[in-house]
Amino acid sequence: MDAQAQTAIKHYAEMQSAPRFPLHLPVEMKSQSGTCSAETQNISANGVLFAMDRDVPVGSLVEFTILLPGDVVGSRRDVQIDCHGRVVRSFEDQGRRGVGVVIDEYHFERV
């Protein structure tokens, strides 16, 4: 196994250690191959697991916006999180794709 693969595995293991919160929200994900609909399955400080109908290859750069309802974040207004990240995991489960994304950059905005 080369050094790059070992680094990726170590980073993924660290990402997995962050607490995950089950949250199912609709999202539009943009990648080089186009835009597709997805649904968050869980969210952590490091990333998001999405359920979707198509594959997004590991290593793909993606952009997506998560709209958190105000009651979830203890606010009167919803909070929008604009995210840039990369796919670190892709698998199939019961006919749907699971896609794990590490968030590299994000921006919060009240809407």
Where are the regions that the model predicts?
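Structured alpha-helical
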Residues: 1-111
